Amino acid sequence: MFSTVEVRSIAVGGQQLRVAVRPGRRGRVPLLLINGIGASLDLLQPFVDELAPSVEVIRFDVPGVGGSPLPVVPYRFTGLCRMISGMLSELGYASVDVLGISWGGGVAQHLAVFQPSRCRRLVLVSTGTGALMVPASPAILARMITPRRYLDRRYLERIAPILYGGSARTDPQRVASTMHDVSRLGSGRGYLYQLAAGTGWTSLPFLPLLRKPTLVMSGDDDPIIPLANARLMNWLIPDSRLYVYHGGHLGLVTEAAELAPVVDSFLAAP
């Protein structure tokens, strides 16, 4: 059995990080998951459960979120990627496959381009190119600048249909239950640090330089990151393919049974 998950805290450059590792099988490249804004590593548990048990899975809470304490000072994507590289070294990994969702997709792009030795293959889910992208509506963006949805379940149930799209339109209670049962929100300042980390950042200039095999995944009903962004990234990244699923921004969680095999097939391909 490969299902046991080890959760522990490690120190990387003076920063404590909460890390979870699900052991896999030798011969397969481990998979690093980078989560979206405000969400702890626990949120992606449904996706991890659907992945082939042979895949070793690494998750972590970014500083100031979940079980990782606030950093001493704010950070940018460059500093966070250095921290991720240090975390991988501390855990004994040289190279991994990388999956980033939403905000974490921006971090994953930065890591793959500027620390290429760390990334073998790249999976970008429900994400975009940063400051220069096809934006969400102003009403959606206004709801994203605050962590209130993680703190107030009734508020989340009310806004989930318009914020996340997909199955959240018909079953917002399921989304609320998932996020409030397994997400551990850090301080409000930690959420703001995440917002600030990507302010002004864009991957548009360097995506044509990305030489990693890349799978771009997007839902056809994602109010936060419109599908046009996935099509743009697929066009810009030389060795990429696009997978469009029927669902919304949280498809990796709500449609995990469909999407996990797609990811696994891409990572296992020759």
Feature-to-residue mapping (PLM):
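Flexible "cap/lid" loop of the alpha/beta hydrolase fold
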Residues: 109, 113, 119-149
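Gly/Ala-rich beta-loop-alpha elbow adjacent to hydrolase catalytic centers
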Residues: 100, 104, 108
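Short beta-strand/loop motif that positions the catalytic acidic residue
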Residues: 210, 216-218
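Catalytic histidine-centered segment of alpha/beta-hydrolase-like enzymes
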Residues: 247-260
